[in-house]
């Protein structure tokens, strides 16, 4: 019975750590860039697009398709960075339970 109580306490502590990690993830922001920094965008931890910055040189007539491609590339860069940060935060929160056989792959 003592082992069960200990296991329950560990599970509750892990649940709190995971909730804290989700809060940290929601607050994070990552920047993605493309075109050598000509396009920058910021994604929130929720995946929401927060900001897009375009270099003024991209505002020239006929650059629309280039701008669109650069925005997509910057978004992909930011999304990759966000996924990496989210996984890192969740692995830290899960502690010894991260990567356990039989556990769902959440991060």
Curated annotation (Swiss-Prot):
The keyword Cytoplasm belongs to this UniProt entry's keyword annotation: yes
Principal place of residence: cytoplasm
Pfam families attached to this UniProt entry: YbaB_DNA_bd (PF02575)
Subcellular localization, as worded in the UniProt entry: Cytoplasm, Nucleoid
Keywords, sorted A to Z: Cytoplasm, DNA-binding
Alphabetized HAMAP family for the sequence: DNA_YbaB_EbfC
Complexes and interactors: Homodimer.
Protein name per its UniProtKB record: Nucleoid-associated protein PHZ_c0369
Source organism: Phenylobacterium zucineum (strain HLK1)
Lineage, opening ranks: Bacteria, Pseudomonadati, Pseudomonadota, Alphaproteobacteria, Caulobacterales
């Amino acid at each position: 019975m003592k082992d069960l109580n200990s296991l329950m306490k560990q599970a509750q502590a892990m649940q709190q750590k995971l909730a804290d990690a989700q809060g940290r993830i929601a607050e994070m922001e990552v920047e993605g860039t493309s075109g050598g920094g000509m396009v920058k965008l910021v994604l929130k931890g929720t995946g929401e697009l927060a900001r897009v910055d375009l270099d003024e040189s991209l505002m020239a007539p006929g650059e629309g398709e280039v701008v669109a491609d650069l925005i997509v590339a910057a978004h992909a860069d930011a999304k990759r960075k966000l996924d990496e940060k989210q996984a890192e935060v969740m692995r830290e929160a899960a502690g010894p339970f991260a990567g356990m056989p039989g556990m769902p792959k959440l991060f």
